[in-house]
Amino acid sequence: MILEQFFNYYFQSIDGDTLKKYRELLPGATDLAAAYADLFSRSDEEAIAFLLDFHDLTARLRQEKPEQAILFNVHNNICFPFFMEYIWKVISKEERLKIKEASGKEDIIEITARLQEDLALRNWFRQEIGSSLSQQDLFILNEIIALQNFSSGGEYSFLKYVYPLVQRMQGRVLDAGCGAGFATLVMSQFLTVHSVDACKARLERAMALSSMMKKGEKKTFPRVIKLIEEELGTMAVQCEFPSAEDLLAGTSREVTFTEGSIDSLPYKESYFDSINCLDVLEHTYSPEEIIKEFARVLKPGGRVFITAPTRYGEVEQRIWESIEGTIFPAMLHMHHFDPQSLTGMFKRNGFKEVEVVPFDFMSWEEFLEIAEKSPARELVEELRAHPFEQVALQLFAVYEKR
């Protein structure tokens, strides 16, 4: 539903040359928005082949005409009014009144125009409105965010930290927040996989890729794996990246896909031998409830593999948010953790720490250079007073159920 609404808005708003490029991908479509939304809801080979062409086009647009491209959380982009209209419909009357008072405008069109031109107002909006979205609103927005990239995050940390372990594991694994399903594909070479995600568009993508891999499809599937590798960029050379040929040649185990939230899993107690949850926890409404569910469905001795952004990742995020004036938290990161808070949350729910590894490092000089651009001067002074050699923006951790 939200995708068709978005494409209707988008195709009516972009310039003629850009619209022509989108029409060329589906030359026979009479209702272009409905046709695009339909293809994003399907899990067949034709839909995946279309998505590859779509992402090739959108990547070019981001480079050549960023104001016309599909971008989330960018105030000078053509999609910005759509997100404002959506938020205006779902927030409370009290929140609408606060926005009217802060902007000095009554109409959402005028409010949107004020937000586009006023950095301070956008920062206020993010802090007062955009940072308190409901879980359902996050799920819906993620349907559109999924249009920006084919992959869904977590591929690098999976390949670097989890993939070497998976090759020695047995049993059933839960891919919690599976996204476009890259980790699912790889893990299914060794384990029975149950994959859950709340984003229907990405889940359909994962289902299609799994089906293509099982059938040994050799035309489109290798293009998909190549695209994921390209989206990883230089990070792909820092870890063992399985080739499409290896995945197609392997014997895939059973994979089951479920659309839903990982804070309410449809599995019995002690069902899984391991859980993979990468680049997910920070996007959720209540991380502790998710850890409780993991404890319920995991066998004693089973392990959870998890990544999460750190306190310094939060600082970097807040700096960029204040510089750009985003109306939502950057990347929709709602939570950040340090080793103590992450481990404490798992220990409260019956886990013990196996390892916590910081990664994604930035030198202190680079970090401070970013901070200097921020309007938040108090933050800059606080950082100057407590220098480090380098900072880690993310954590990889393994916890074992007692």
Which role does the model predict for each range below?
Residues 373-402:
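Core SAM-dependent methyltransferase catalytic element
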Residues 276:
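A conserved beta-strand element that flanks and buttresses the S-adenosyl-L-methionine
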Residues 2-264, 291, 321, 392-395:
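Conserved N-terminal segment of class I S-adenosyl-L-methionine
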Residues 325-341:
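Acceptor-substrate binding/catalytic loop of class I
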Residues 305-327:
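Conserved class I S-adenosyl-L-methionine
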Residues 279-280:
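Short catalytic micro-motifs in class I SAM-dependent methyltransferases
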Residues 288-300:
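A short glycine-rich, Lys/Arg-flanked "PGG" loop and its adjoining helix->strand segment in the class I
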Residues 354-378, 390:
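Conserved catalytic loop of SAM-dependent methyltransferase domains
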